[in-house]
Amino acid sequence: MPGQELKTLNGSQMLLVLLVLLWPPHGGAVSLAEASRASFPGPSDLHSEDSRFRELRKRYEDLLTRLRANQSWEDSNTDLIQAPEVRILTPEVRLGSGGHLHLRISRAVLPEGLPEACRIHRALFRLSPTASRSRDVTRPLRRQLRLARPQAPALHLRLSPPPSQSDQLLVKSSSSRPQLALHLRPRASRGRRRARARNGDRCPLGPGRCCRLHTVHASLEDLGWADWVLSPREVQVTMCIGACPSQFREANMHAQIKMNLHRLKPDTVPAPCCVPASYNPMVLIQKTDTGVSLQTYDDLLAKDCHCV
């Protein structure tokens, strides 16, 4: 009987079956969602554990190679694929019944070109600018953009309760400054104009002083990840640093207004800040409650910078 044959499989054979079933197809772009789901329970036998880790390591290297290949193709086809623009909104937030979060987003602050749900590449919500966690609200926001009446003055999102009591207290606090980061796919023609403008950037303050991409070599210990990340042991962290002088890599009209007001009222209006405009994905082999897993983070390493 087929069922009886399946029962005779040992741990190593079952692991091989899982690897065959979950291995991504060769060629084409790799699915980050599929990579995030890859997780395997750890066998008790030490030899099986070593073998399983070697297989996972091979998968990690294959996934990393394909991600780099995808990135190289994007870099060589900038007229076809442009980095998402990032817009920071400040929605109104309140706690509803059952502890659910209710977000109100005024249509007046939505970027030009919305409501086009397809332009939303990703939407990340934070209870405050310094919050360590963000919540992915891409799907509910896209749904609201598709279904809400065009004449409605605002969009309303209902989210699950905050995971911790401290987050619930932050919502009620007057110091809460929630942020919604919209990563937008630019229109093709506009994207080409922005790419040409970026190529002509010249820092008026001198070389290396304006908003730019900077790389820092860090170990897992430096990052505080040594207790939950297995590989890679060292990371080339790309981040955005530098000043934002007038008309230099301004992300939007708000950045222009902010700079003008900063010149008039430097004590009350801060200058625009240098922040990531897009990101490169990064793959980690990390520990889980059931063993180890592959996890792809697509908002960890800065790829490009602008002033907001």
Swiss-Prot record:
This is Growth/differentiation factor 15. GO terms for biological process: GDF15-GFRAL signaling pathway; negative regulation of appetite; negative regulation of growth hormone receptor signaling pathway; negative regulation of multicellular organism growth; positive regulation of phosphatidylinositol 3-kinase/protein kinase B signal transduction; reduction of food intake in response to dietary excess. Residues 152-179 are annotated as: Disordered. The keyword Disulfide bond applies. GO terms for cellular component: extracellular region; extracellular space. SUPFAM superfamilies: Cystine-knot cytokines. Induction: Expression is up-regulated by obesity. The gene is GDF15. Glycans are attached at N70. Disulfide bonds join C203-C210, C211-C274, C240-C305, C244-C307. Its main location: secreted. Belongs to the TGF-beta family. Keywords: Cleavage on pair of basic residues, Cytokine, Disulfide bond, Glycoprotein, Hormone, Secreted, Signal. Hormone produced in response to various stresses to confer information about those stresses to the brain, and trigger an aversive response, characterized by nausea and/or loss of appetite. The aversive response is both required to reduce continuing exposure to those stresses at the time of exposure and to promote avoidance behavior in the future. Acts by binding to its receptor, GFRAL, activating GFRAL-expressing neurons localized in the area postrema and nucleus tractus solitarius of the brainstem. Pfam families: TGF_beta (PF00019). It is found in: Secreted. GO terms for molecular function: cytokine activity; growth factor activity; hormone activity. CDD domains: TGF_beta_GDF15. The keyword Signal applies.
